[in-house]
Swiss-Prot record:
Residues 402-477 form the B5 domain. The gene is pheT. Keywords: Aminoacyl-tRNA synthetase, ATP-binding, Cytoplasm, Ligase, Magnesium, Metal-binding, Nucleotide-binding, Protein biosynthesis, RNA-binding, tRNA-binding. PANTHER family: PHENYLALANINE--TRNA LIGASE BETA SUBUNIT, PHENYLALANYL-TRNA SYNTHETASE BETA CHAIN AND LEUCINE-RICH REPEAT-CONTAINING PROTEIN 47. Binds 2 magnesium ions per tetramer. This is Phenylalanine--tRNA ligase beta subunit.
Length: 802
C-alpha cells in the first residue's frame, strides 16, 4: 500500500514529521518497506510530439524519430515501439533522466549506427500501468498545446510503501492507516462529514441479486447520476492518482480509484446509456464470455459472480468491469456500484482466470461490508462537485443482513499473555480509537468489533491489538530459567518407547505409516465401530482414519512380498480410531510376521511361522515390560479378522478386566480378498491404554540371572482330562506348585484314541525342577511329584494316566 504524507494528513491531524510517522507505522505493525522520492526525479519527463518517423537503415524493427520537445527544439530518438508514428503525442525522457521502473539512467548512445538522444517512454516504464506494448499515447485535444511541458506535476513529495499483512485489509485505505496512527497517539483522526446530497429522483435502473447457490454478492448498492460532464480530473485528484503509480483517465474513473485508495472501498462506474434494460447479479454459466477493461476476452466457468444485463455479462463482480458499459469522456449518465462480494469467491474466480486488479486484491482480503453507503456518498459528492449532474436516491439490494460481531474480553488476560499491565481505562481508550464499541460490565469488557476488522474473533486478537498500539517495546526481556527440570513421561509414553525396543529386539522392523488408510481395506479390520471418514483426503486411497494398524501394515508387507522378500517381520506403534468421541482413540503396538522362522542352528529344521511364535513374542514383550507371566490369562477369543482356530487374547489376570493383546493367524479370507499369496501370516495387537502400571519398574528390566550349582531334574507327567480343557490352565496349575523349584513346564504330547475314554484326551508334559540351595534327593523329588499330581487332580479334575 502506497501513501503520501500529504494524503495521510487529509485524515490525520498530526504534528509529527514524515520520519516520525514512518517510525510510528513500523512500531504498530505496519512495516514501511521503502520511501520513493518523487521530488525532481520526474521533472525531466516532458510532453513531446513525433514530427517524423522513418525506418532505421540497418534494423527492420526500429524507427528513427524526429521529436519536438518544445521551444522549437527537436531531437533524434531511435525507438522500437510499433506505434511510433508521425503526429503522435507521447512522453520524452532526455539523457540524464532516470526511468522509474528500471531505475536506469539514460545516456546518449549509438543504436545500429544512429545516435539516439534520450527515450520515448511506455506507460509501464513510467509505472503508470502495466501497458508495455508501445509508447504512451496522449490525447491530442488535451495535450496538443502542452508540448514541452513537464508531464508530471512538480511536487515535492515522498511515496511511503507499506507492507500490509493479509489480515489487515482495513489498512489498504489511507483512512485505515490514519486510524491506527491516531490510536497509537500520533495525532487525531479527522471526522470527515460528507456534504448532504440533494437527491432529486429515485434510482431508475432496476438491480436484482439472484438468490442462488454460492451467490458471492450479498449486497449491491447503486446511485444514478444524470447529466454529468465527464471531464479531466482537477490537479489535486491527478496528483494523488499519479503519486500512487496510477494513470489519470477521466474524472469519473479517477474518483472511483481515489475512493478505493482513500477509504478501501472499491467502486465501479457504468455508462447507463449502454446498459440493456436491467442489471442482474448472478452466477455465470460455463462458456460465457466478456471483454474486460484490460481489453482481454475471458471465458467463464460455472458459478463465477457476474454483473449482467439482458445482453450478457457486463463485468466480473469485485474483480474487473467490461468494456461494453465502460465510461468515456462523452458519458452523460453514470451508475455508481458499491457492493460486497465474498472473499472466497473472488479468490477462486481470479485464480482461475488469472486476473489481478486492485479491487480484487481488496475484496479477496475482506473489505468493510457496511461501507456501501459511505462509498456511494463520497462518490456522488465528488462527481457532482467535479462533473455536475443530478443524483438519485441510493438503491441498496441485499440477500442477507450483515451484523457486527461482538465478544467479551477479560482485561486480566492481557497481563497473562504479555507480561505487563495497562489500566483498563487506557484499554478502553485504545479500543475506542480503533473503532470498537466498548461497555464495561463488572470488570469484563463487552466489545462490538468494527465491521472493517474481519480478522478479530477472539480475546487473544484483542490482546494483540492492545499490545500493538501500546508498543511491543513495553514487553520486558526476561532471561529464561537455566535450571533444567527433569523430564517426566507417563506410563503410556514409557511403554511406547520400551515396546519399540522390545519388539524390535525380536527381529521386527519398525514401520511408520499414515494414520489414514483405504476404506476398502479398513473395512476388513472393523468389528463394531464405525469408520471416521476424511472430508478432504490427501489421496483417494487415504480416505478414512484407520481402525486397525493392520490395514496399513498388511499393504506394505504385500508390497515387499511382491519384491521377492518372503520372511518378513514389521511392527508399528501408533493411534487407531474407533470413533470420534473422547476415549475412542487407542495407542496400539501392532506386528505382522510372514514366511519361515529364522533357524538358530543348522541342526534345526526349517518351519513356518505360527500362532505360537507370535504368542511368544507378545508374552515376552509383556514380561520384559514388568508384567508377571504367571498372572497373564489367555483364552481363544479374538476378532473376526483372526483365524478362529488359531488365535487368542491375553488379559493381565484371570478376572478378564480388559484385553491387553490379541494374537493369531490372519484370517485366510482377508488374504484372499487382498490377493496376498503367503504360506503363513500371523499378527498381534498390544493395547497400551489397557496396560496398568507393572509392579516392576520399566527401568528395572535387566535383573541378575540366578544360576544354580546343583543338578536339575526332569519329570514327565501324563494327565487324562476333558477334550475341551485348555492346556494353559494345566500349565499354570503345575507352575504354581513351587515357583522357586519349577523352572519350566512344556507339553510334548497330546493323545486321543485307544485306552483313552471318549471325550477325553491325554496331555503329556515335561517339568524341569531346578534346586538353588541343595541337590534334591529321591524323596524330595517324589514329594514334588505328589504335590503336582494332587494339585492338578484337585483343581482341574484331571487324572494321572496309568
Amino acid at each position: 500500500m502506497k501513501i503520501t504524507t500529504a494524503w495521510l494528513k487529509d485524515h490525520l491531524d498530526t504534528k509529527l514529521n514524515e520520519n516520525q510517522i514512518i517510525d510510528k507505522l513500523t512500531d504498530i505493525g505496519l512495516e514501511v518497506e521503502g520511501v520513493d522520492s518523487q521530488s525532481g526525479e520526474l521533472d525531466q519527463f516532458v510532453i513531446a510530439k513525433i514530427l517524423k518517423a522513418e525506418k532505421h537503415p540497418d534494423a527492420d524493427r526500429l524507427r528513427v524519430c524526429d521529436v519536438d520537445i518544445g521551444s522549437g527544439k527537436s531531437v533524434k530518438v531511435v525507438c522500437g515501439a510499433p506505434n511510433a508514428k508521425e503526429g503522435l503525442l507521447t512522453i520524452y525522457a532526455p539523457p540524464g533522466a532516470v526511468v522509474p521502473k528500471s531505475q536506469m539512467k539514460l545516456v546518449v548512445s549509438k543504436i545500429r549506427g544512429v545516435t539516439s538522444y534520450g527515450m520515448l517512454c511506455s506507460e509501464s516504464e513510467l509505472n503508470l500501468s502495466n501497458e508495455s506494448d508501445g509508447i504512451t499515447e496522449l490525447l491530442p485535444e488535451k495535450y496538443n498545446k502542452k508540448v514541452g511541458e513537464n508531464y508530471f506535476p512538480k511536487k515535492n513529495l515522498n511515496v511511503i510503501d507499506i507492507s500490509i499483512t493479509p489480515n489487515r485489509a482495513d489498512c489498504l485505505g489511507v483512512r485505515g492507516i490514519a486510524r491506527d496512527l491516531a490510536a497509537a497517539g500520533a495525532g487525531r483522526l479527522i471526522n470527515q462529514k460528507e456534504k448532504k446530497l440533494d437527491k432529486k429522483n429515485k434510482q431508475t435502473i432496476s438491480v436484482k441479486i439472484e438468490n442462488e447457490k454460492n451467490q458471492a454478492c450479498i449486497s449491491f448498492g447503486s446511485c444514478l447520476i444524470k447529466g454529468v460532464k465527464n471531464t479531466e480530473s482537477p490537479e489535486w485528484l491527478k496528483d494523488k492518482i499519479i503519486a500512487l503509480g496510477q494513470k489519470p483517465i477521466s474524472a469519473i474513473v479517477d474518483i472511483t480509484n481515489y475512493i478505493m485508495f482513500d477509504l478501501n472501498r472499491p467502486l465501479h462506474a457504468y455508462d447507463v446509456d449502454k446498459i440493456d434494460k436491467a442489471i442482474v447479479v448472478r452466477n455465470s454459466k460455463k462458456g460465457e464470455t466478456f471483454e474486460a477493461l484490460d481489453n482481454k476476452e475471458y471465458k467463464l466457468e460455472d458459478e463465477m459472480c457476474v454483473i449482467s444485463d439482458a445482453s450478457g455479462v457486463l463485468g466480473l463482480g469485485g474483480i474487473i468491469g467490461g468494456t461494453r458499459t465502460g465510461t468515456e469522456l462523452d458519458t452523460k449518465n453514470v451508475l455508481i456500484e458499491s457492493a460486497y462480494f465474498s472473499p472466497r469467491s473472488i479468490r477462486k474466480s481470479s485464480k482461475i482466470l488469472n486476473i489481478d486488479t486492485d479491487a480484487k486484491f481488496r475484496f479477496e482480503r475482506g473489505i468493510d461490508p457496511l461501507s456501501i453507503d459511505q462509498g456511494l456518498e463520497r462518490a456522488a459528492n465528488l462527481i457532482q462537485e467535479i462533473c455536475g449532474g443530478e443524483v438519485s436516491e441510493f438503491d441498496i439490494q441485499k440477500i442477507e443482513d450483515v451484523k457486527k460481531k461482538s465478544l467479551k474480553f477479560d482485561p486480566s488476560l492481557f497481563e497473562k499473555i504479555t507480561g505487563f499491565n495497562i489500566d483498563i481505562k487506557e484499554m478502553i481508550k485504545i479500543l475506542d480509537n480503533l473503532g470498537f464499541e466498548i461497555k464495561e460490565n463488572k470488570g469484563i469488557l463487552d466489545a462490538v468489533i468494527p465491521s472493517w476488522r474481519p480478522d478479530i474473533s477472539q480475546e487473544v486478537d484483542v490482546v494483540e491489538e492492545l499490545v500493538r498500539i501500546k508498543g511491543y517495546d513495553q514487553i520486558k526481556i526476561i532471561e529464561p530459567e537455566k535450571v533444567r527440570k527433569k523430564q517426566t513421561l507417563n506410563l503410556k509414553q514409557k511403554l511406547f518407547h520400551f515396546l519399540q525396543r522390545s519388539i524390535a529386539s525380536k527381529g521386527y522392523f519398525e514401520a511408520i505409516t499414515w494414520s489414514f488408510t483405504d476404506s476398502k481395506i479398513n473395512q476388513l479390520f472393523i468389528e463394531n465401530n464405525k469408520e471416521i471418514k476424511i472430508i478432504n483426503p490427501i489421496s483417494s486411497d487415504l480416505n478414512v482414519l484407520r481402525s486397525s494398524i493392520f490395514s496399513n501394515l498388511i499393504i506394505h508387507l504385500n508390497k515387499n512380498l511382491g519384491r521377492g522378500f518372503k520372511d518378513l517381520s514389521f511392527f508399528e506403534i501408533g493411534p487407531t480410531f474407533l470413533g470420534s468421541e473422547p476415549g475412542e482413540q487407542q495407542t496400539v503396538a501392532t506386528g505382522l510376521r510372514s514366511g519361515k522362522l529364522a533357524r538358530q542352528s543348522w541342526l534345526e529344521k526349517e518351519r513356518l511361522i505360527d500362532v505360537f511364535d507370535v504368542k511368544s513374542d507378545v508374552i515376552k514383550s509383556l514380561v520384559e515390560a514388568g508384567y508377571n507371566k504367571d498372572k497373564l490369562y489367555i483364552d481363544d477369543e479374538a476378532p473376526s479378522y483372526y483365524h478362529p482356530g488359531k488365535s487368542g487374547r491375553i488379559f493381565l489376570n484371570k478376572g478378564k478386566e480388559k484385553v491387553v493383546a490379541f494374537f493369531g493367524d490372519i484370517h485366510p479370507g482377508i488374504l484372499k480378498k487382498l490377493d496376498i499369496k503367503v504360506e503363513s501370516l500371523v499378527g498381534f495387537e498390544i493395547f497400551l491404554d489397557n496396560l496398568k502400571q507393572p509392579k516392576k519398574s520399566l527401568k528395572d528390566q535387566k535383573t541378575q540371572y540366578k544360576y544354580s550349582d546343583f543338578q536339575k531334574s526332569e519329570r514327565d507327567f501324563a494327565f487324562v482330562l476333558d477334550k475341551n480343557f485348555k492346556v494353559q490352565e494345566l500349565i499354570e496349575t503345575i507352575s504354581n506348585v513351587d515357583k522357586e523349584l519349577i523352572k519350566s513346564v512344556k507339553v510334548f504330547d497330546v493323545y486321543e484314541g485307544a485306552n483313552i475314554p471318549e471325550g477325553k484326551k491325554s496331555i503329556a508334559l515335561n517339568v524341569i525342577i531346578q534346586p538353588l540351595e541343595k541337590t534334591l534327593t529321591e524323596d524330595d523329588l517324589n514329594k514334588i511329584n505328589q504335590l503336582i499330581i494332587s494339585a492338578v487332580e484337585s483343581k482341574t479334575g484331571a487324572k494321572i494316566r496309568s
